[in-house]
């Protein structure tokens, strides 16, 4: 029988686990300000391609898929390619990141995410030298590729799943967590809610 006032084995285990979690350092790739910066970049790129590059959404491909289907339904096959190419570039970006991850996972001198960030910054310089109008398709393909690279590489902030190139999922999760908070009044849930809504605001 456990001595009164002393935690049981199960309680000690839970307490030790909580202390361990509190002292585990947050990875740089999951830090709040890095994710905030990436989220602002994601929001800017969506505005940039839609306003200045022919009304194409570079980040989330839902809009492009809808417009692709609409153009096909209306018989505008050639115009539909305008939306198909960014979708294909997005898919290639996902595959590219997985290749980078597999190739450099054990590389001790450089983390694979550092390679991704360097590549993203380099590629985002190119549209500045590509004239609006004549190069819109190429720019949209390039930015869709970059956004796929970002969303596949940076998927967590402080251990929580998050998206840095779109806000629908973040908005859904934050609102869902409100329901749980109203029932539990758990402080950690409240912090998660705040974090998700902050990312939505940074995207805006």
Where are these regions (language model features)?
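Acidic, Ala/Val/Gly-enriched low-complexity intrinsically disordered segments
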Residues: 3, 11-14
């Amino acid at each position: 029988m456990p001595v009164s006032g002393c935690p049981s084995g199960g309680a000690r285990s839970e307490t030790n686990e909580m202390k361990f979690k509190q002292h585990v350092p947050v990875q740089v790739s999951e830090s709040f300000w890095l994710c905030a910066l990436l989220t602002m970049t994601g929001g800017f790129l969506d505005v940039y391609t839609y306003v200045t590059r022919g009304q194409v959404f570079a980040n989330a491909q839902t809009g492009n898929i809808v417009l692709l289907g609409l153009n096909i339904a209306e018989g505008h096959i050639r115009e539909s390619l305008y939306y198909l190419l960014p979708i294909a570039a997005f898919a290639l970006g996902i595959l590219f990141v997985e290749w980078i991850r597999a190739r450099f996972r054990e590389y001790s001198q450089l983390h694979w995410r550092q390679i991704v960030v360097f590549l993203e910054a380099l590629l985002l310089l190119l549209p500045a030298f590509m004239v609006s109008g004549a190069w819109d398709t190429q720019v949209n393909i390039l930015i869709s590729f970059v956004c796929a690279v970002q969303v596949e590489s940076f998927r967590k902030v402080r251990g929580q799943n998050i998206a840095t190139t779109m806000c629908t999922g973040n908005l859904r999760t934050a609102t869902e967590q409100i329901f749980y908070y109203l029932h539990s009044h758990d402080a950690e849930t409240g912090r998660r809610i705040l974090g998700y809504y902050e990312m939505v605001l940074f995207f805006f």
